Structures are given as structure tokens and as C-alpha cells.
Amino acid sequence: MKYWDFRESGKPQYDYYAYTDGSYLVPKNFGAAACIVLDRDAERVLYQWSEASRYSTSHRQELAAIIHALLHVPERSSVLVRSDCESGIALLTGQVRSKKDGDLVDLYRQVKKDRELNVTLEWVRSHSGDRWNDYVDYLCIEALDLFESKGTRVREGVDSEALFAYICKQ
């Protein structure tokens, strides 16, 4: 199995690494977002979350996962966020604009500023054998399955209120 390793790629080391993913099932009108936060060696999962919700889009799920990850790294730290959503990264870095997702872009910027985070966004090809990207993809699928079969929104009761409390504060 191939997976990304900063020691082999010559990438700078960060305080934390995060992987995020989002998905959406159009016919069923619900989607899921997931993230994991890893230690500075990108080997141990420090935090993981996944949640299913209705009435969204795949793109919004991807952006929500990135924001959620940022809410779960310590303030004033550096974090490399790896996502398989090129358009989401382009949106958050200001390469493209979107009226539809502007609220989440604003929220991303506010979280980054308020928490004094040094964030680097990096694209990873989906389904390419990267173990952590594959894992967050699995968490999304699991969240969708739990939501469809049992109506369970949050994986194993992991607290997801941080994102929604932050949004309500605005």
C-alpha cells in the first residue's frame, strides 16, 4: 500500500496533520463529512469525527470537514490539511470564488484567524492508496450507512457541537 510520507517527500514538518473528506448521495438527499487529526509524525490519530446530514452538497460537506478539523487542533499551531477536493482548496485559498459557499469560506477564515493557526492546504488524489485519505473516505461511507440504517448522525457519539456552536456564535 502506498501512502504519503512527509519524510520521503521533503515536506516541512507541521505540528499537526489533518485529512478531510466529504460525500453526498443525491438520490437520498443526505451526505457526510469526516476528518482526522494526526500527531506531528502523521502516524497516530489524535481525533476523528464523522457526521451525516441532510440538505447539503458534497462541496459543503468537504468544506465543513476542513473547518471541523481546524477546530480540533490547538490554537497557535501549524497544520497541514490534506483533502481530495481540489475545488474546495481553490475556494479556501482564494483561487476561485463562490457565492453559494461564501459563508463557509468566511467561517474558515474566521476560525483560522481566531485560533491563530498556520494552515497549509494540500490536495491528495482520492482512492490513490493514501492510507489516511482512504480512512476518512471510509468514515464518510460509514456515517452514510449509519444514518441510512439507524438514523445515527454522529459516529460513536463523538462531540460535533464545536462546529455548530462556532457557527451560531457568528
Predicted ranges, named:
Residues 2-60, 64, 70-73, 166-169:
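RNase H-like nuclease fold core
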Residues 20-30, 66-139, 144-152, 156, ...:
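RNase H catalytic domain
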